[in-house]
């Protein structure tokens, strides 16, 4: 036991020394309120400190991007991972002498940090889609899609890079690239040949560590591209026979948007109203709203879902349901509003 404890202590000291040297090699960084970008990035994963950290990155602007990329690369370091793993096992006296391990900086932390910079970060994100680091590639693809929330943002310049990212070895990169392309709509028609094969993606992570919904993301993107994605219809129609109701629903909406087919898609959407998670039903409501009077068979179920207990999700869904009813059957919408 003593031998193992001694080995653990020496291992920690060695790791701490390596990491100290690693951090000292970092180039000089911009600062804000006397703190470097890296110091602010340390606070991003910490709920109590993240608000101030995001405000600081917004103030620093594009000059913070190199540090964000560097931090994402460092997050993949086996040294950091091992140090975080071993530190809690140290004797308290020794732990006081060593630096606290840095909180894990995940891809969504990096994506949020990029978004603090705003639309001006787009050229950096496009370039970083080819970065050697998986964390950087996932974060940049995710951030590019989320730029749609910014006034004046236009990610059409990213379409070629995002299309190439559909071939990335990582399912997470493929997922976020497909989502981002969907937000560009018909402008992404050139990506259709690269999106179609993703409808057959295995979606299972290596080692069965979870499922990545690449097929649904690809189907959604093809639907948002619209009639220019007609080449995808044969494969999309085959997905309507899948067991996964969420995939069937997203596919049904996509087919409707590409081909205006109500006959084969509305029954799937009606099934989805009761079978998929409430957090995902908004996609069903949007599809039915687009169908208008042709979705009249769904009116009774839509009206019944207006009466669900009030929660943040149900309140959001109620707005979507009300809009769908107004598009499908204004008279039914008016009656439902009076209840």
Model-identified regions with their sequence ranges:
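Surface-exposed, flexible loop/turn segments at secondary-structure boundaries
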Residues: 76, 203, 278, 310
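Hydrophobic membrane-insertion alpha-helices, especially the h-region
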Residues: 8-23
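Amphipathic alpha-helical scaffolding segments comprising HEAT/armadillo-like alpha-solenoid repeats
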Residues: 34-41, 62-73, 119-130, 152-167, ...
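Short, Lys/Arg-rich N-terminal segment immediately upstream of the first membrane anchor
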Residues: 1-4
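Acidic helix-start/capping segments at beta-turn-to-alpha-helix junctions
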Residues: 70-74, 82-86
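Structural detector for internal amphipathic alpha-helices that build alpha-solenoid repeat scaffolds
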Residues: 22-31, 42-60, 83-119, 127, ...
């Amino acid at each position: 036991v003593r031998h193992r404890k001694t080995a653990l202590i020496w291992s920690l000291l060695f790791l701490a020394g390596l990491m100290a040297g690693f951090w000292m090699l970092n180039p000089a960084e911009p600062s804000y309120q006397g703190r470097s970008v890296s110091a602010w990035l340390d606070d991003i994963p910490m709920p109590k400190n993240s608000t101030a950290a995001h405000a600081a990155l917004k103030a620093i602007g594009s000059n913070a991007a190199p540090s964000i990329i560097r931090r994402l690369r460092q997050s993949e370091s086996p040294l950091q991972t091992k140090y975080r793993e071993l530190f809690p096992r140290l004797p308290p006296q020794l732990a006081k002498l060593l630096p606290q391990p840095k909180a894990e900086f995940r891809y969504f932390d990096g994506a949020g940090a990029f978004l603090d910079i705003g639309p001006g970060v787009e050229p950096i994100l496009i370039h970083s889609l080819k970065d050697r680091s998986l964390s950087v590639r996932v974060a940049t693809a995710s951030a590019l899609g989320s730029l749609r929330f910014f006034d004046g943002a236009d990610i059409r310049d990213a379409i070629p890079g995002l299309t190439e990212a559909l071939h990335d070895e990582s399912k997470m990169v493929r997922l976020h690239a497909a989502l981002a392309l969907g937000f560009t709509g018909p402008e992404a028609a050139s990506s259709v040949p690269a999106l179609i094969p993703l409808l057959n993606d295995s979606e299972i992570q290596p080692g069965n560590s979870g499922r990545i919904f690449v097929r649904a993301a690809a189907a959604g993107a093809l639907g948002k591209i619209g009639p220019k994605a007609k080449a995808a219809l044969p494969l999309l129609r085959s997905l309507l026979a899948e067991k996964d109701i969420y995939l069937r629903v997203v596919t049904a909406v996509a087919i409707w948007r590409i081909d205006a087919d109500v006959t084969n898609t509305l029954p799937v959407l009606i099934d989805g109203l009761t079978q998929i998670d409430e957090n995902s039903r908004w996609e069903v409501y949007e599809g039915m709203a687009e169908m208008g009077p042709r979705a009249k068979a769904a009116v009774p179920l839509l009206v019944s879902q207006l009466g669900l207990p009030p929660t943040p999700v149900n309140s959001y869904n109620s707005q979507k349901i009300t809009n769908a009813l107004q598009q499908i059957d204004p008279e039914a919408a008016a009656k439902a509003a009076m209840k």
